[in-house]
Swiss-Prot record:
N-acetylalanine carried by residues: A1
Name of the protein in its database record: Myelin basic protein
Key word Heme present: no
Spans annotated as Disordered: 1-21, 45-116
Modified residues (N6-acetyllysine): K123
Modified residues (Omega-N-methylarginine): R43, R49, R108
Family stated for the protein in its record: Belongs to the myelin basic protein family.
Length: 172
């Protein structure tokens, strides 16, 4: 947008805002709308589509649309903490119910701490490249959940086998 300004002084604001809005709306939202995280991210980039879900009513809807065009970059940067919350939420929802029963307490503590570290590692990806990496990160995240399941079960088998001779950590 800033490059266009000197040469196309006239309609530059409209041109830039319309094009960015179109990209945000058509490029990002419809394709991944079903994922849930991206819905919440879509609130920041698509403005009108995600806001009504928020329950903020028409005022929020208009505010999002009006401030949306000029402050697209700042919005994504300032919104990073909020962007991360749905991601962490997503990991919590998808991963915690799958943790095995408390009977394997030893293994569970180990894997949970390990997994929370994994979730932490995901955060920067979502925060920094929010728009570009939405699609890839989400799928990576989903794959990560399955991988984690595999590693979790592996850790649990380890934990179960080694419980006689101390925890897996002690053995290493």
């Amino acid at each position: 947008a800033s490059q266009k300004r000197p040469s196309q002084r006239h309609g530059s604001k409209y041109l830039a805002s319309a094009s960015t809005m179109d990209h945000a709306r058509h490029g990002f939202l419809p394709r991944h709308r079903d994922t849930g995280i991206l819905d919440s991210l879509g609130r920041f980039f698509g403005g009108d589509r995600g806001v009504p879900k928020r329950g903020s009513g028409k005022d929020g809807h208009h505010a999002a649309r009006t401030t949306h065009y000029g402050s697209l970059p700042q919005k994504s940067r300032d919104g990073r903490p909020q962007d991360e919350n749905p991601v962490v939420h997503f990991f919590k929802i998808n991963v915690t119910p799958r943790t095995p029963p408390p009977s394997q307490g030893k293994g569970r503590g180990l894997s949970l701490s390990r997994f929370s570290w994994g979730a932490e590692g995901q955060k920067p990806g979502f925060g920094y490249g929010a728009r570009a990496s939405d699609y890839k990160s989400t799928h990576k995240g989903l794959k990560g959940v399955h991988d984690a399941q595999g590693t979790l079960s592996r850790i649990f088998k380890l934990g179960g086998r080694d419980s006689r001779s101390g925890s897996p950590m002690a053995r290493r």
